[in-house]
């Protein structure tokens, strides 16, 4: 006994079952039932089926699926013809309509009054009342509940690949098509196709009949027809629109309401695949970024070759004689382009100019020229002579001229020092103790004169001898005067003089520690500067000596030639 055909023509390609809990896809994109799909997924080959369990496909379904013209590349016409079309909603609807028409013709052939039944040729020639129903309705307009007019198209106005409408066949009440992947309903409850339903949902009006297409763009699937040339041709047809036949097929599918994308000039271009034609999907090369409208072409393509996280490391390397990276040093704490320790070029237009940055790390600007000559260590007497020679060599405009300490006559740029965190030498802040910054500001900037009881005791009396010897040997930061200095303490230490004294000693120790750190950093900088200056002097002397030897050698040879 032959198996009952599926009402929608959906059956497994392996066992031909029409019912399953879940439909799956095989490696060739064919439709499989749940059992065959899981077997194929885990064992990588088809599930064996017994001969008695094998279901036969209806001849009508075999004919439709074999003689169809659909390529299965995402542009569906509901006729079948490829493995991807199995289970397509449009194909299922077509097979159901064919089954309904076949059963209807069978019932007419079994009618007791054969004279009332027209012949097969008359049935094909003359439309039935149900078939001509959309044509009659197309000339009239009906008012909906929203007050908008609905237009219904006739079956003869736009050719449809579906057969004549039957009572069991669902067709769109707006465009009279039976080829759709999803059925929807309008505000009155009538079935409409997916395109008309989405158009009404988005725009609030019914879809014009002129937008009707015979081909539906479905989800793109891979094509496994066994013909590689045909599949490649389909991919090229979708990616490019320059060939003649491809453009014609593209325009046939898209219709008069095809989308157009703006080009670089801001005008709409009908062919959106020109960029992909040159840089297609098959080549794997993306189109250049300049073809996009919103692309900014001001990027010069300059990227730093290396990053140096520490300027002090750069100074030590230069002092050891190592060359820098093409005259440019980059720091990780700022986005600016810094210059190296080498002399600045005479032509300022060569290369990229340094960017101007408002961020001033540690009080030194990024492009500020520092120390035009040799620096002397702090505390030497020669520092005064250097300052006097520098001031004496300044002209009326205030511009310093080259002196003997700078034989090259060029200015050098030193990178700024990385800011040191304030948590290096400071004690942890607690809620009980006031902030150090507030204490320094209150001590150095008194707002109102304190009372006589708030005066700090003299530095030579009483417990002042408890100061450590290291602090007593150092020179005070502020010169002591005959009259005691008036200080204003924060409200947390407005108690006894002992609390004020302890607070003042704490602030003084913090200031001295910061002073020691600054002195040490300046000492290290002076050592590096002296080493660099000595190296530059020695290299300059070597260059001058080599030039002198080259200039004197031809004269000796010439004199020898004259003597001979």
Swiss-Prot record:
Pfam family, one: GATA
Function according to Swiss-Prot or TrEMBL: Transcriptional repressor that binds the consensus promoter sequence 5'-[AT]GATAA-3' during iron-replete conditions to down-regulate transcription of target genes. Represses the expression of the iron transporter fio1 in response to high iron concentrations. Also represses the expression of str1, str2 and str3. Represses the expression of shu1 in presence of iron.
Positions of region (Disordered): 100-170, 226-285, 381-409, 443-496
GO molecular function: 2 iron, 2 sulfur cluster binding; DNA-binding transcription factor activity, RNA polymerase II-specific; DNA-binding transcription repressor activity, RNA polymerase II-specific; double-stranded DNA binding; iron ion binding; iron sensor activity; iron-sulfur cluster binding; RNA polymerase II cis-regulatory region sequence-specific DNA binding
Organism, scientific name: Schizosaccharomyces pombe (strain 972 / ATCC 24843)
Notes on how activity is controlled: Activated by iron.
Protein name, per record: Iron-sensing transcriptional repressor
Assembly description: Interacts with tup11.
SUPFAM superfamilies: Glucocorticoid receptor-like (DNA-binding domain) (SSF57716)
